[in-house]
A protein has these predicted regions:
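C-terminal accessory region of SF2 helicases/translocases
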Residues: 580, 584, 592-693
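Short boundary/loop segments of OB/S1/cold-shock single-stranded nucleic-acid-binding domains
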Residues: 44-64
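Long, highly charged, low-complexity intrinsically disordered interaction regions
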Residues: 1-17, 25-26, 228-229, 239
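Inter-lobe coupling/hinge segments of SF2-like helicase ATPases
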Residues: 267, 272-275, 285-603, 612, ...
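Structural detector for short beta-strands of small beta-barrel domains
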Residues: 60-81, 120
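Short, surface-exposed secondary-structure boundary micro-motifs
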Residues: 69, 121-122, 561, 575
């Protein structure tokens, strides 16, 4: 149960003074629904209001706090005109300007003849000193409250600084003193304050440098967040190791048949990955392993060989893909090999006919089907296995944790292999999975040629179209990707449709269009026409599925490449170069290019190594944006910056390991404090869900 002391932090933000239902909705959108969410919403800038000149000495552009006497209100006749309030001190006059100002409100705020302290940005307009909508107007006895460095918080539409500052200040006040969960020697070495003092300090910066992620207060809080995350992962890992697993040993007879039917040798890293998986499956503990392989590195084959270990042991295995296109593709790759090895394989998707579905469900339940490939249809309640030994989940950041769990729970202590084509930098791997066992596929299969990557200004699009014409005349196939502009799906669609129209005029009957609004069946028909060569050019917004395999595709054109992230560019480029023919990737960009965009395109030209590209992407963009953490299954860090805090992440991992060695049930005095930490960062539910791997 959550410690009693944390109760005030887990109240709704509407329990804070000044936050009613309307503001509550906006605050929830900004930071989250609970008081604790506001604690993690740190300021990104400061405003120094300590400068208090007389009117005559106030300079344009500076933030000033000035004490004045209110003289007169000039109420506009026309509501479009500004409302002006003239004030003065001994040195000169100051005009306070309000647009859409209400007379009753302003006369109450600034009563004529009274002294007021105003703070805001100074402007000089037609020789007059002026402030438009001052940030603060208070009586002289509240002057000291304004004369300070003020934190500036990120906002969402409809919110202003004042209520957010007030709500966060109250949230910090309500935060309890908690028992220290950090290792005493480690904290002393870093010269860090206690949790509560660090929190108060992070929300009350004195100058710009206090906003650095390396400032002691911020570093302390970042470490706490990382420790909670690493400890949650380590606890689950420990729990999984103590739960008796399936000992699954194969004798190699089925795999030998498959390997004989391959027209090529496995790469060294494919062999190593299969060896690691085989050793894991033979252990009494449950396997949870990540198979990381760049686009086109042969993950499906490794997955098949892993699944066949289960079949050799007399059990079953399942592979779950995020989309029907991918499930069908995996099935098509595996089917001839399964047939050659005498293994019964089925496909299960949401669009199967009743008769076929019934047969598949029957075969899985009685064990006559050995392998199944499917979409999330596999996790439906009606799906039962006779004896599921291995669950393989492809492109896992598309699945919610509960879907991974659901597939794993279709048997007893099912081994889990998670495949991803997204090369994740080491730091992010550690943050997301702790010490998860990882197999990496680093080489491309034999016979694949390097891709010729070029950057070309958009003005030369005519030459690109001519080059595309030459490619398709020789039987090549071309992807043409139009960028996704986040704000508007309509604009994207218009861009893609316009490009489709222009290319169709050049190459009638040869061009297809693929975008997010097409129904599943239309998308699949278009993809099939392209794969079979009835279409030579496929114009698409970025919905070309990860893993879609068209070996005859030799050219990838990406319009406005400067708008894409590195990981995305790399994923798209991986759609070509999958056959033996020479392939090219043409990155079209609009001038002038910003520094980051320049660096991104340069890296694309230099290397095809997805792991190096991922590290560069982390360096250029920071972890938050890297994979769009929200959809990626990676933890959504509020305080830690994985690029800046890589060393703290390592330290948090080491500390979590030590805790598990010494006190796996968190029963000691420090253990009790660490439980509070897990609740504070809401890792109590993560402890439950992470059992899915």
């Amino acid at each position: 149960m959550r410690p009693q002391s944390l109760t005030p932090l887990f109240a709704q933000t509407t329990s804070l003074p000044g936050i009613g239902p309307r503001l509550g909705k906006l605050v929830e959108k900004l930071a989250g629904p609970l008081v604790v969410d506001l604690l993690w919403h740190l300021p990104f800038a400061v405003v120094d209001r300590r400068h208090a000149p007389e009117v005559a000495h106030a300079k344009a552009g500076e933030i000033a706090t000035i004490t004045v006497t209110v003289e007169e209100h000039l109420v506009p006749r026309n509501p479009r005109q500004p409302y002006r309030v003239w004030c003065s001190d001994e040195t000169g006059r100051l005009c306070l300007t309000y647009f859409n100002g209400r007379e009753d409100y302003l006369k109450k705020l600034l009563p004529p003849g009274e002294v007021r302290v105003v703070s805001g940005k100074v402007e000089i307009y037609q020789g007059e000193v002026q402030m438009t909508h001052p940030d603060h107007v208070v009586p002289p006895d509240q002057r000291e409250q304004i004369l300070r460095v003020e934190p500036v918080y990120g906002l969402t539409a409809g919110l202003t600084q004042r209520p957010v500052q007030k709500a966060i200040a109250t949230a910090v006040e309500r935060s309890p003193e908690l028992p220290e969960w950090q290792d005493a020697a480690f904290r002393k070495r870093n010269k860090w304050d206690g949790w509560h003092a660090a929190l108060a300090r992070a929300h009350a910066p004195d100058e710009e440098t206090d906003l650095s992620p390396m400032h002691p207060a911020r570093a302390r809080l970042a470490f706490d967040e990382l420790l909670a995350s690493q400890l949650a992962i380590a606890l689950v890992r420990h729990h999984n190791r103590t739960v008796a697993g399936h000992v699954t040993k194969g004798d190699g007879r089925v795999r030998t048949k498959v390997l004989k039917n391959l027209p090529f040798e496995l790469t060294p890293s494919q062999k190593a990955a299969v060896g690691e998986i085989e050793a894991d499956m033979a252990k009494p503990e449950r396997m949870i392993r990540l198979l990381q392989g760049d686009v086109g590195s042969g993950k499906t084959l490794v997955a098949l060989l892993a699944m066949l270990i289960g079949v050799e042991a007399g059990a079953q295995a399942a592979l779950m893909a995020p989309t029907e296109i991918l499930a069908r593709q995996h099935h098509a790759t595996i089917a001839p090999l399964a047939e050659a090895a005498g293994v019964r394989l089925a496909l299960l998707t949401g669009r199967d006919g009743q008769k076929q579905k019934k047969e598949t469900l029957q075969g899985l339940a009685d064990g006559s089907i050995h392998l199944v490939v499917g979409t999330h249809a596999l996790v439906q309640e009606e799906v039962e296995f006779a004896d599921l030994a291995l669950a393989v989940v492809d492109e896992q950041h598309r699945f919610g944790v509960h879907q991974r769990m659901a597939l794993s729970s279709k048997g007893h202590a099912v081994d889990l292999l998670v495949m991803t084509a997204t090369p994740i930098p080491r730091t992010l791997m550690l943050a997301a999975y702790g010490d998860l066992d990882v197999s990496k596929l680093t080489e491309k299969p034999a016979g694949r040629q390097p891709i010729d990557t070029r950057t070309i200004p958009l003005e030369r699009i005519g030459e690109v179209a001519d080059a595309v014409g030459r490619q398709i005349a020789g039987g090549g196939r071309v992807y043409w990707v139009c960028p996704l502009i986040e704000e508007s799906e309509d604009i994207d669609l218009a861009n893609a449709e316009e490009r489709f129209r222009l290319l169709s005029a050049h190459f009638p009957g040869k061009v297809g269009l693929l975008h997010g609004r097409l129904k599943g069946a239309e998308r699949e028909a278009t993809m099939a026409a392209f794969a079979e060569g009835r279409l030579s050019i496929l114009v698409a917004t970025t919905v070309i599925e990860v893993g879609v395999d068209v070996p005859a595709a030799t050219v990838m054109v990406i319009e406005h490449a400067e708008r894409f992230g590195l990981a995305q560019l790399h994923q798209l480029r991986g759609r070509v170069g999958r056959g033996a023919a020479k392939s090219a990737c043409l990155l079209l960009y609009a001038q002038p290019l910003g520094e980051t965009a320049k660096a991104r395109l340069a890296i694309m030209r230099e290397t095809e190594d997805g792991f190096r590209i991922a590290e560069e992407d982390l360096r250029l963009r920071g972890a938050g944006e890297l994979l769009g953490t929200r959809q990626s299954g990676l933890p959504d860090m509020r305080l830690a910056d994985l690029a800046a805090h890589a060393e703290l992440l390592q330290a948090a991992r080491d500390d979590a390991r030590l805790v598990i060695e010494r006190d796996p049930d968190l029963q000691s005095e420090r253990g009790a404090a660490l439980r509070a930490l897990l609740y504070l960062f809401r890792r109590d539910d993560a402890v439950r869900t992470l059992r899915a791997g």
